[in-house]
Amino acid sequence: MNAVSQPVAHTAAGAVRGEVDPRTGVRTWRGVPFGASTAITGRFRAPQPVDPWKGELDATRFGAPAMQGTFGLRGTVLGSEDCLNLDIVRPDTDDVLPVVVCLHGGTFVTGASHDKVLQGHHLTKATDIVYVSVNFRLGVLGYLDVRSLGDDCVANPAIHDQILALTWIKDNIAAFGGDPDQVTIMGESAGGAAVMHLMCAPGARGLFHRAIAQSPPPASVHSRIQATMWVRALTGRVGLPPNPTLDDLRAMPAEDLVRAGQSMMINSKELLQFNTSFMPTIDSATLAEHPIDTFNQGKQAPVPMIVGTNSDEASFTKALYQTAGQRLRAARRALDVFDPDNAGDVIEAYGDVGQRRDFAALMGDAVFWAPTVIVATAHRMVAPTYMYRFAYASAAMRMLGLGAMHAADLVAVYGDPYATKAAKFDRFGSKETFEKVSELMQHHWGTFFHTGAPGQDWPVYGFRHDGQPGRATAVFDTGMHVEHDPKAEHRYAWESFDMREWGANRVDFWD
């Protein structure tokens, strides 16, 4: 590297020329390719390394994100199949720094490395890291197992993409001043789930050393039977004849496949995407078994982990159903597809689920908090585990009934109060408090990036012993404090609920 306005780094494939951002003063390299195009012959196959190039590659513009729908009336499709690229941000120094790799969220179907909230400039300066955000295949092209149509494919292209990116980072990040032996992977929502999938994937072992999963849905996986059903639905929706082949899908315009996949999601009738059309499939290469089973058996990567959820993950569901009866039926239906024998006991633990507040609490816990507690409980047996709850919400967000909703923690962790539209409400009337919370979270996240522990005032999610209550949880509200085994009564209710299997006898939406 050289300390000029256009820093050049030399990777194994060739030189890349970045720039110093005039607004934030950090060095950036955007759209750096780590894999070859996945179009046509590469579709549904494992990714291949990028071919070398001559001269300096211009890395001053963001690369293409993965192909994805916009869920608008026009059926617009964004992105490209040539999407295997990443963005790198670091302070304008020549220090060797720990590396943080961000895997974006977006329900496994949307998102990009350069989503404004994830660009990482403020986080990089606050925590002194080399920050890498990654693009990988999504939706029908990244999270649909099409092996029922032939063997010339892989089950989880997106996970293979992520492993290739981590391999590239291990081999090349030193050229950007990053320490390849201090790599933290982090993600939120589907990105948090991706972190856990990589912890379970044998091919990712040794490519990272710490993990942060924010609001992950750990139970969001398909069995091969479920994936086969979704493939059948897709091929019917795009008008392929009976007994289609992989070549038939590869011959179709990618835009048509993405639109069909978007239509499948909209019409699947699955509340809150408990089990959407697109998510990883249990296979023999990346996910040998359900991630919850992998964690319970202690087979995951034994690395220090921060994991947690927000207090009001599913507050937006309050507006989805207008009557108490509708909410009760929706709650029962959502849980019955997993474990009908124990669904009633869980629902009873949440009081009157016909009321909006209790209904939203149940839904958020079902998708995020309850399975996260299971994972944290298991992981503490193999590595230091740190649990948190993000509870900060401005007066405006509380007045709207949204509270600390899903993804609200991102703005605090990344430190950019202008990154999202919702962040405007965090600033409204409470700017100083928000900045305090953001500084606290960045301090603890940064300490973890550098040391593998978030600080002495945040205990491990440990066991009850010597009079200590155990299950220490850092709560970020207007400040930070520690609670032990919060929501214990709800945790007890979920202990007998099996969230690993889904819809074994469901056929009503394959018609």
Name these PLM-found stretches.
Residues 27, 81-84, 160-163, 167, ...:
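A structural signal for well-ordered alpha-helical segments within the folded catalytic domains
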Residues 463-491:
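C-terminal domain-tail junction helix/linker
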Residues 1-156, 423-441, 449-457, 480, ...:
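Non-catalytic accessory segments of hydrolases
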Residues 71-246, 263, 268, 294-320, ...:
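Serine-hydrolase-like catalytic core of hydrolytic proteins
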Residues 137-139, 186-190, 389-394, 460-468:
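Short, solvent-exposed turn/loop segments enriched in Gly/Ser/Thr/Pro and often Arg
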Residues 24, 28-51, 319-338, 460-470:
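Short Gly/aromatic-enriched secondary-structure transition segments
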Residues 210, 256-432, 444, 451:
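Substrate-gating cap/lid region and adjacent catalytic-acid/histidine neighborhood
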